[in-house]
From Swiss-Prot:
It comes from the Eukaryota. It is a peripheral membrane protein. The lineage of its organism: Eukaryota, Fungi, Dikarya, Ascomycota, Saccharomycotina. Its main location: membrane. Residues 1167-1196, 1285-1298 have a biased composition (Basic and acidic residues). This is Actin cytoskeleton-regulatory complex protein PAN1. PANTHER family: ACTIN CYTOSKELETON-REGULATORY COMPLEX PROTEIN PAN1, EH DOMAIN.
Length: 1492
């Protein structure tokens, strides 16, 4: 489709005169032949491209413009041709009164350039006066409009020409450049030369006008409609010039009628009524004022109107600003692009004068897509932010959600429009008329088509001379609104024309884009003034707009709904100068509720309503918050405040720290003041100031200003002052050389004031008024005074000042006054308490301060004093609490250590396949590894320190590092600077040349670099050592896991942590090493061992016992002995259980072995010697055992005869059983039962159950065994081993008494924690009377009765069986017991003195001796045992030798007193077991047979 706004090439001015006839004819013929083909192509093409509804009315032409049949008058744009007649053809009249359209549809045989004689009144052409100037018409001298022709062969009437002699001319002179109206399709002088289509193309597209149309539609509407207008059939050729021959006037009467209006019911399309635009314009774009200033400077280079920017509003900028930004955006965007590049945007934004840093922040906020280019909404946002900054606002850290959403929505709309535009608007195809744009019309200049203003409708047309050469005419009234183009002179010899006349009413105006679908009313287009034009439907698609009378100067226009589709806006009268317009809601573009609550404004000449003005406050984040009213006028606005007109010096003095700044700086101070001292040391404060990035000189200046007292520390207020000065410098202000009074901390002011007061008080006389120093703070008015509670004044520094100054002055004479600087201490860390007499100051106070103020000051003094005391007490409490907490922590640590030391070790069962010596070696190595690594770490540390010292010696420097690891501290730097300064000054004084050395900084840098290299090397070495330790720990862990069967060493990290001390604190690691070394006994050690360890004199004995226990453990591992259980356990468990418990018995000794081997490496030799001795003892025991067995059998028979002896022997046997239990318990490793009490406990429980008789039983059993019992010797194991002969004699005498001689058990009495065993032997002293027990044993029936009471206290059931079992045993020893035991008793006594622990145990002996008689009632328990034994005693005798052999082979491994336990009580124990399982023979004792 042809675009009338497209640039059509250079159009040269056209002549308006006429050419000779021959030239005109030739031109006509050539033009017709050339343009005919183009016209035909244009018809065919546009008939398919343009509006389909009109195709049914179109008659396709068979020839081009030059070859039309005579019966048709077709125009190049055939798609607009319809069959519907135009009402203008039937009702209009010529000015002269003749009807020119009488033959409108009858003339069908005229040539294209001919005219009918009967169509035009000749008189009209002959009368020159009928030619009037065309002031408002768009045609000058015969400008025609193409009209839609009916399909029938109808000749168009040339409505604009009167008859004249030149009507039959075949050629017309070229037209001069015209400023009249529309040139689109019919310049009469040019019709024979060019087709109407080409003319239309030259002059700006298919623009159609009425001949005398005085209503010009808005230019923007015409621009939009020009893209869709279709050109109708060409007008018939008319001769418009003056005919040169006499025959021409006759031909002039035959002018053909031309259709000048639209012959269609369809609304006319808008046409461009102005001159050709050089560039296409956006449809519906309102006229904008001429761009000036900043925007115009960019827009002068041209505006890119091809950019597709949706018509959307951005709420954060005004509509005017958005229009300006859009113009600026279009002026800088290159063709084919929708974004402005970064360079172009920078060129625009840099002209704002903002700093590049600020512009960079703005760019970051606006470039939402991070593409480096900005779309229009992003550009508008950037310009908005720049304006905000220029007006004093700050750049937001982040865009608010509303603005961000608007920008994103705008960008989405742009993207959618680009996509839809690319699919819906394909590239335009070439048309047959394209060549005419550049070739045929290249000589035509753009023509102004006449913009007739409303004020020119009433101007009458001037008479024109229709003959001869016309003078240049102003062919149109170019108003001020027609783009400022000057009017064109239409020079050239024009023929006389009938330019006025009574033309038929024409459909005038073009249907603008604002009135689609509404038919235009017919208008009178004749030459007379047309005051009453028909109203037309106006407005842009607004169905509610009222039709308006579009004629000239219509005062009473209908009210219209104004605004952009805003239903809430009041209808306004849009006529001329309506004074009283309706009030409208102003504010935002929204409706009703979104108008920011502003008052409705009358948009006419009525006074405006007052509204809140100004910008939203920065702190108000609600974008719709109402604006606050601002003070206006001189004196009320902050701009006119006095401080803005003062000098810069005054402003500097008035500088102060705001409350917000103070709170912020105080928080920073409290963060770094971790010790709550109220002072910040210089390194910390300097480091904080240094983070600001200021240079050193400025920081020094700031420090000198804020460190008022020159103490190298800053109080809270001084720190806040320093931070304020830092920010002041960062903001570009100059630092003062002296602090202004407003910046001096109030604490310093108070102190200075107090000092001055004290000076005055000291120098004043009682009768003379003291000159007191008063400052501004003394007279400062406190608005809160006497209104608010006094606590509000506590936080005001000046009140403290007033307190300290005037309180002195106002106190009654003679009363002591304390001036307290409590608040000062809170900020400065200095507490000032001054007590002085206020007598000399009283006169001054009475002259200055009222009584009420004195009372208030005194009250504030008391409050401050109370606060100070409370603070002091609080600090004291905190100090005491911290000390108590430390003590509590230490106590908890000590208790934890004790608990850890008392916890028993886990019993690990070692792999028996690994040799014992290998286990010892592994334990030794593992215990040695952490020590080695600790030594290696110490050596490595010493090496690194030595390297540093060596570097210092090799490179002496003025700066020496005294910090950790040789680092240089600030103190070292100060010393080095002092030394360098002193050295330079001394050199200057002495006149010596100062040595040119390196600066302190260079020396420090070299030193630090060397130290860093040494540390790095040391770190690498430590890393290598750590890797080695990790590998060793893995090997050790796997090895220990193998040794313990997976019980230990499974977790390598845990093993490394607790065995090697990796990752533990020094104190914890030391404690673990102490545990391992034996300094603190392990949990597996017996309580008796702990008791022995507490006594230094028993340390040696304890170590020997440990050595013997290790030896026995190793023997057990070799399989020589089987561990034996205590009788108490045997009585409750079967032999299978006894075997099962044998294995765990080893583990405690293995554990103790590991702990002891680490600390006692020298015991190996002693162990070897002990082994040899034990082997010899065992051989002797075997031989003696055989002899004793035979002798025992014989003695048993004798014992039966003597009941007394048998009873004593049975009691002794029972006692032996009792003693056996504690020994085994001790050996098994039950830490909870100490050896001594364990021996006594079972008996004591029995005694409790048996009332008083239990004690003698204990004594009896112990007495029977004590003289010969190995346990006594085991406590003195070393002494017993040293005197082997004495020990052997004891055993023999013991076996003579006991019926069960288990000599093989003597090997292992030592492991039975001799300490516990010792008490057991003590009981034996009373055992001597114990023989009485056998008597009750026989009367089994009697025993049951007493047994009943016994059970209650006998809660420990195992204890009861112990005495019961021996009853059978007693018979055997009965015979020897009366004699042997008594003398034997002294033998154990000898060993007792050697052992310290047994000695205290002796006391029970006398008790037992005194109680022997009551022992008899203890017999009752024996019957119980007897009942259990009755069925079992028969079998034992034969099995005795066999049992002995078995016991010999098994008991070598026992950890308890294998000798004593198995020799005497073993028989009892075996009988106890027999009670549970009769299958086993008791102990081979012969007594059983005699019992039944």
């Amino acid at each position: 489709m042809f675009n009338s706004f497209q640039q059509q090439g250079t159009i040269q001015p056209q002549g308006t005169g006429y050419y000779p006839t021959q030239q005109g004819q030739q031109g006509q013929q050539g033009q017709q032949g050339q343009q005919g083909q183009q016209g035909q192509q244009g018809q065919q093409q546009q008939s398919f491209q343009s509006q389909p509804p009109f195709n049914s009315y179109v008659q396709q032409p068979n020839a081009g413009i030059g070859g039309f049949p005579q019966g048709q008058s077709s125009f190049g744009n055939t798609s607009q041709m319809t069959n519907q007649p135009s009402s203008g053809f039937t009702s209009g009249q010529y000015a002269g009164g003749s009807n020119a359209n009488s033959n409108l549809f009858n003339q069908s045989s005229q040539q294209f350039g001919g005219v009918g004689n009967n169509n035009v009144n000749v008189n009209q052409s002959s009368d020159p006066s009928s030619l009037l100037p065309q002031g408002g018409s768009y045609n000058n001298a015969g400008l025609q409009r193409p009209q839609l022709q009916p399909v029938q062969s109808v000749q168009s009437v040339h409505s604009m020409h009167s008859l004249g002699p030149a009507q039959t001319m075949s050629s017309i002179n070229p037209i001069q450049s015209q400023t009249g109206d529309y040139y689109g399709n019919a310049l009469s002088q040019q019709q024979s030369r060019t087709s109407l289509m080409s003319t239309s193309s030259q002059m700006g597209g298919n623009q159609l006008y009425d001949t005398n149309s005085q209503i010009l539609q808005p230019q923007q509407q015409q621009q939009q409609q020009q893209q869709n207008i279709q050109v109708t059939a060409p007008l018939q050729q008319q001769s418009t010039g003056l005919y040169s021959s006499a025959s021409q006037p006759a031909q002039a009467a035959n002018l053909q009628p031309q259709q000048t209006g639209f012959y269609s019911q369809q609304p006319l399309q808008p046409q461009q009524t102005g001159f050709y635009a050089q560039q296409s314009q956006v449809p519906l774009e309102p006229l904008k004022p001429t761009a000036t200033g900043f925007v115009n400077s960019f827009a002068n280079n041209g505006i890119n109107n091809d950019i597709k920017i949706p018509t959307m509003r951005l709420s954060f900028i005004t509509a005017q600003d958005q229009a300006k930004f859009e113009t600026l955006f279009r002026s800088r965007v290159s063709k084919g692009s929708n974004t402005i590049s970064g360079d172009n945007c920078r060129a625009i934004l840099m002209k704002s004068g903002l700093q590049p840093k600020q512009l960079a922040k703005i760019w970051t906020l606006c470039d939402t897509s991070k593409a480096g280019e900005l779309l229009f909404p992003e550009f508008a946002l950037a310009m908005h932010l720049v304006n905000e900054v220029l007006q004093g606002d700050s750049i937001p850290y982040e865009l608010d959600i509303k603005s961000k959403n608007e920008v994103n929505s705008f960008i989405d709309a742009i993207n959618m429009s680009i996509v839809s535009g690319s699919t819906e608007e394909p590239a335009k195809q070439a048309t047959p008329f394209d060549s005419l744009f550049t070739n045929g019309l290249s000589v035509l200049q753009p023509q102004a088509t006449g913009m007739i203003p409303a004020t020119s409708f009433g101007v009458p047309l001037q008479n024109q001379m229709t003959g001869g050469m016309l003078n240049p005419q102003a062919t149109g009234m170019m108003p001020q609104t027609s783009f400022g183009m000057p009017m064109q002179v239409t020079g050239g010899p024009l023929l006389s024309q009938t330019t006025g006349g009574a033309l038929q009413p024409q459909t005038t105006g073009f249907m603008p884009s604002t009135s689609f679908g509404m038919p235009l009313q017919t208008q009178i287009t004749g030459g007379a003034m047309m005051p009453n034009l028909q109203p037309q439907t106006t407005g842009s698609m607004m169905p509610n707009l009222q039709p308006q009378t579009t004629g000239s100067m219509m005062p009473n226009l209908q009210p219209q709904t104004t605004g952009s589709m805003m239903p809430n806006l009041q209808s306004q009268t849009t006529g001329s100068m309506m004074p009283n317009l309706q009030s409208q809601m102003t504010g935002s573009m929204g409706v009703g509720t979104t108008s920011f609550g502003m008052q409705p404004q009358a948009t006419g000449n009525i006074s405006l309503q007052p509204n809140p003005t100004g910008f939203l406050p920065v702190s108000n984040f609600n974008p719709t918050a109402p604006l606050t009213a601002q003070k206006t006028g001189f004196g009320n606005n902050e701009i006119y405040s006095q401080r803005n007109f003062g000098s810069s010096l005054g402003q500097a003095e008035e500088d102060s720290i705001s409350t917000e700044e103070k709170s912020l700086f105080y928080k920073i101070f409290e963060t770094y003041d971790s010790q709550k001292k109220g002072l910040l040391d210089s390194p910390t404060a300097v480091e904080i100031f240094r983070k600001s990035g200021l240079n050193r000189s400025d920081l020094e200046h700031i420090w000198n200003l804020c460190d008022i007292n020159n103490r190298g520390q800053l109080s809270k207020q001084e720190f806040a002052l320093g931070m304020h000065l830092v920010y002041r410098k960062l903001n570009g202000k100059i630092l003062p050389n002296r602090l202004p009074p407003s910046l001096i901390p109030s604490s310093n002011k108070i102190l200075d004031n107090v000092k001055n007061q004290l000076k005055v008080a000291s120098t004043s006389n009682d009768t003379k008024k003291a000159p007191s120093r008063t400052d501004g703070l003394s007279y400062k008015n406190n608005d809160d005074e006497n209104i608010l509670p006094s606590f509000r004044n506590r936080r005001k520094n000046y009140s403290t000042n007033g307190t300290s100054s005037s309180s002195l002055d106002n106190t009654p004479r003679g009363s002591p006054v304390t001036v307290s600087g409590a608040n000062v201490s809170s900020d400065t860390g200095v507490t000032t308490a001054v007590t002085t007499s206020s007598a000399p100051v009283a006169p001054v106070a009475s002259a200055v301060v009222k009584d009420g103020r004195i009372d208030m000051l005194q009250k504030s003094i008391r409050e401050k004093r109370g606060q100070l005391e409370a603070e002091i007490s609080r600090n004291r409490r905190m100090l005491n609490q911290s000390a108590e907490n430390r003590e509590n922590d230490m106590r908890m640590i000590g208790s934890l250590k004790d608990k850890i030391a008392n916890v028993p070790h886990i019993l690990y069962t070692k792999n028996s396949s690994i040799p014992d010596d290998l286990n010892r070696r592994i334990d030794t190595i593992v215990s040695r590894i952490p020590v080695l690594f600790s030594e290696i770490a110490d050596i490595e540390f010493a090496i690194s320190n030595s390297k540093i010292e060596l570097y210092k010696l090799q490179n002496p420097s003025s700066i020496i590092g005294s910090g950790p690891h040789g680092e240089i501290t600030d103190e070292d730097r100060k010393k080095a600077r002092s030394k360098a300064l002193l050295k330079s000054r001394m050199a200057a004084l002495t006149g010596k040349a100062e040595e040119a050395g390196n600066s302190i900084e260079e020396e420090e840098a070299r030193y630090n670099k060397a130290v860093a290299n040494i540390r790095n090397e040391s770190r690498k070495n430590r890393g290598i050592i750590g890797d080695i330790r990790g590998s060793i720990s893995e090997l050790s862990a796997s090895l220990m896991s193998t040794l313990t069967g997976g019980a230990a060493g499974q977790n390598t990290s845990e093993f490394e942590k607790w065995e090697f001390g990796v990752g533990l604190e020094k104190e914890v690691r030391t404690f673990i090493e102490t545990l391992k070394s034996g300094g603190i006994l392990s949990g597996s050690s017996l309580s008796t061992e702990t008791n022995l360890n507490d006594k230094e004199d028993e340390r040696v004995q304890y170590l020997k016992d440990q050595a013997q226990r290790k030896m026995e453990q190793k023997l057990a591992e070799l399989g020589i002995n089987k561990p034996a259980e205590s009788p108490s356990q045997q009585s409750l468990s079967s032999p299978s259980q006894m075997e099962a418990q044998a294995t765990p018995v080893k583990s405690p000794f293995q554990e103790t072995q590991h702990a002891d081997e680490r600390s006692e490496d020298s015991e190996d030799e002693e162990e070897k010697r002990l082994r040899e001795e034990l082997e010899r003892i065992k051989l002797k025991k075997k031989a003696d055992k055989e002899k004793r067995l035979a002798e025992l059998r014989r003695q048993v028979q004798d014992a039966q005869a003597e009941s007394d002896d048998g009873f004593s022997s049975s009691v002794s046997g029972s006692n032996n059983g009792n003693v056996l239990a504690p020994q085994v318990e001790g050996t098994v490793g039950h830490v909870e039962y100490p050896a001594v009490p364990s021996a006594a406990n079972p008996v004591s429980s029995v005694s409790a159950s048996m009332s008083g008789s239990s004690t003698p039983v204990q004594g009896t059993s112990a007495a029977a065994r004590n003289p010969f019992f190995k346990s006594t010797d085991s406590s003195n194991s070393t002494s017993g081993l040293s005197d082997l002969k004495a020990a052997e004699a004891q055993r023999r005498s013991q076996r003579g008494l006991d019926d069960d001689a288990d000599a093989w058990s003597d090997d292992e009495p030592s492991p039975v924690a001799p300490a516990p065993v010792a008490p057991a032997p003590v009981a034996p002293a009373p055992v001597a009377p114990a023989p009485v027990a056998p008597a009750p044993v026989a009367p089994a029936p009697v025993a049951p009765a007493p047994v009943a009471p016994a059970p209650a206290p006998v809660a420990p059931s195992p204890v009861a069986p112990v005495p019961v079992a021996p009853s059978p045993v007693a018979p055997a020893p009965v015979a020897p017991s009366p004699v042997a035991p008594v003398p034997v008793a002294p033998s154990p006594a000898a060993p007792q003195p050697s052992n310290l622990p047994p000695v205290p145990i002796a006391p029970p002996l006398p008790q037992v001796q005194g109680v022997p008689q009551p022992v008899v009632p203890l017999a009752p328990p024996l019957p119980q045992v007897k009942q259990e034994e009755q069925g079992n005693f028969l079998a034992p005798p034969p099995s005795l030798p066999h049992m002995d052999n078995i016991q010999n082979s098994q008991n070598l491994d026992s950890h308890s007193d294998q000798d004593d336990v198995l020799s005497i009580p073993d028989s009892v124990a075996s009988e106890d077991e027999l009670g549970d399982e009769p299958g086993l023979p008791p102990s081979g004792i012969p007594p059983p047979p005699p019992l039944p």
